Amino acid sequence: MKFVDEVQIRVDAGDGGNGCVSFRREKYIPNGGPDGGDGGDGGDVYLIADENLNTLIDYRFERFHAAERGENGQSANCTGRRGKDRILRVPVGTRASDEDTGELLGDLTHHGQKLLVAKGGFHGLGNTRFKSSVNRAPRQKSSGTPGEVRTLKLELLLLADVGMLGLPNAGKSTFIRAVSAARPKVADYPFTTLVPNLGVVRGENSRSFVIADIPGLIEGAAEGAGLGIRFLKHLERCRVLIHLVDICPVDDSDPAENAVTIVKELEKYSPELAGKPRWLVFNKMDLILEEEAVEVMERVKTALAYEGPVYQISAISKEGTKKVCYDILDLLDTMPRQLAEDARDAIEKVEFKWDDYHKNQLAQAEAEALAASMAFDEGLDEEDWDDDEDDGVEVIYVRD
């Protein structure tokens, strides 16, 4: 199946149902009061994370998704049925943002997590809601509000513990084949890897970690050269980065300059990503003499001002790969996952369009009715108030 990690879709929440104007009319009850019911709320649109999915390709061809409209209110104080919600299933690791405003709606980082992305319209109010002491037969109602319409940008960010960086043909795919059961394509030309690959590295005592191999970077990737930096986003969730350096490039380029190029492109993309723990791993050590290798490694470390751990491996023969993996396992044990907490802290409360639409509507109607009642009372004199009935014959008794 084709790997698709970024799509744009439109989601339409359901409109709210309209309120109803109706009066109770039954035999022997000629003056029944209002009985118009409220409409139903419009359906919402949700994203839900599904661990059985690994690509967003389904949304490449189906881009419009709408929830159901709420039904209108009916007589006899019958409330309209609420519209059905629309549930969109996406892979774990999907990030949703509003394409128009740039607002980050949320990250779906574990199976079954649910995210509201478009809120349905609020229901309209029936005329029963507007009944008051001075308005016994209200003929006003309110219409339901439209549901939210959003253009969403969905990005799939792979959930890996370790990410690999390097120029094309540095040996990243060969390394991941050597340490895991993943089988990415390996060939002797640049950009053999066109999409990210994941591999599971298993150690002793049931310990394991997930490693991500992304397409190689070249100079100018931040400006769109090569495959650009679109795949660097898959490293944002990684806890450790492996910078794989080809110590003996086939094009006779300088390994030190190549290493500096990768770090610069990383810093251009994200200073936060560049600040993650990064290990320097020299590959293809079997193709160079030991004295030359020492000199090249010193030049690379000096160019990068690097003081962290350094590893020497040959991915094709698996020499030195086990030590790298075991040391990574030890490091990860000291770096507990904080993905879910960090994601919740980073995302601000999402404001939806109709959250407070009718918050004061009923209060305002009650205030207007109270004001009308007070104005009516002030227009009456005290002598106008008596307990006599206005209809029928009034009899006055006079004492002799």
Swiss-Prot record:
One annotated Gene Ontology cellular component of this protein: cytoplasm
Swiss-Prot/TrEMBL cofactor(s): Mg(2+)
Gene Ontology terms for molecular function: GTP binding; GTPase activity; magnesium ion binding
Domain Obg: 1-159
Binding site for GTP: 166-173, 191-195, 213-216, 283-286, 314-316
Domain OBG-type G: 160-333
Enzyme class: hydrolase
Major location (coarse): cytoplasm
PROSITE patterns found in the cross-reference section: G_OBG (PS51710), GTP1_OBG (PS00905), OBG (PS51883)
Keyword Hydrolase: yes
Assigned keywords, A-Z: Cytoplasm, GTP-binding, Hydrolase, Magnesium, Metal-binding, Nucleotide-binding
Enzyme Commission number(s) of this protein: 3.6.5.-
UniProt subcellular location: Cytoplasm
NCBIfam families: Obg_CgtA, PRK12297.1, PRK12299.1
Protein purpose: An essential GTPase which binds GTP, GDP and possibly (p)ppGpp with moderate affinity, with high nucleotide exchange rates and a fairly low GTP hydrolysis rate. Plays a role in control of the cell cycle, stress response, ribosome biogenesis and in those bacteria that undergo differentiation, in morphogenesis control.
Family (UniProt): Belongs to the TRAFAC class OBG-HflX-like GTPase superfamily. OBG GTPase family.
Subunit structure: Monomer.
Name of the protein described by the UniProt record: GTPase Obg
